[in-house]
């Protein structure tokens, strides 16, 4: 299942690390955050290496919808109310500057990545009052926003908040252009970190500073990020023979659609849900909406993405923990990774090189006063539910009762396992306990994967780890029907 970006951009293969490497800074993760941070640190004169578990852009960067905007849903009214105007202004300023810095780099360096300056729209079906509050908040924080009762959308809406001068682009074309300037080891997963030493399957990296930019920090202690975040999945479809008015569109309601265009196609996305809580049907819903909104359109690609959602409501960017002052982190972008990645690169570079940044406070992972105890308690409750379901209760079907293409808990060879029936004769079976912290995995019928509802790790039908925080594969087997 390749995204429209993966179908239209292939980067060169880079060798893995063998032996030892040394650097001033080691960056874990070769996505947008890791590559931008590594490049900015290198431009400040530091020696930097990047360790990437798969390949550059092979994680969430290649599965984004790539809206480069400081408008992140209806966030600003809530930030002002919860954190105060000063910190809300920090968030707005950091992301507004991120959009401009990213566009300036593309234009000055002549990077061919289909950059298009356009407006961003937050719409609602019937919540005009919420839109008016958000427009007022955005303007108060210095953003060029306005409430518009009429929008160009092919939807019945009550209006939209228009933020002028934002951008959209091809994320992988941009990323590969930057990656060519860096020292990157692909197929080099970091398995363990001790101080400034990174341990990988075939070697080690020694560094004075370590940046965790791997989407979800895989280190449980210190930091306890697994207790302060959850992950969500969402789904996208690229449509040919469809026309969208200029702009990027994002709905206020949970069931609203997100839309943008790319080179004659329209990207329609939505269907967000907590990872591991998927009853299926999300691609079917997208296809139904596509024909209603764009009759006669044709599907060019479909894919899904995963996002880290923080309890605090803003990303965690800064020092990883007080216990390890040489570690830094950027995570929890809450679906807005393009601008937040650029903001993180600027902020982390300043912290490492200068010791401070004027907008660091709003992103500080260690600011406990900024956390939301109720949300953290909810994350703990969700994890407790998953841990409490380690053992299957009640009867489960026999593996041969599953239809071809169907998966779920089933009995195979006298043992209860997670079983996927690939053909009439072949079954793939995995243990249903997540190797991260032991939560019971759930079947994802849309992506045909085993997903953890506690912290969001995912595995394919053969047990191979797809997303962190888990770092190891599942015990698995393949059986043929006798």
Each language-model region and where it sits:
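Rieske [2Fe-2S] iron-sulfur-binding domain
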Residues: 237, 409-482
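C-terminal catalytic lobe of FAD-dependent flavoproteins
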Residues: 253-254, 278, 283-285, 294-380, ...
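Glycine-rich FAD pyrophosphate-binding loop
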Residues: 43-63
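Flavin (FAD/FMN) cofactor-binding and adjacent substrate-gating region
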Residues: 2-8, 74-80, 101-174
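Helical element adjacent to the flavin cofactor pocket in flavoenzyme catalytic cores
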Residues: 136-138, 160-208
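Extreme N-terminal leader/targeting segments of oxidoreductases
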Residues: 1-25, 464, 474-475
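Flavin-dependent oxidoreductases
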Residues: 193-261, 400
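N-terminal Rossmann-like FAD-binding beta1-loop-alpha1 element of flavoenzymes
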Residues: 23-50
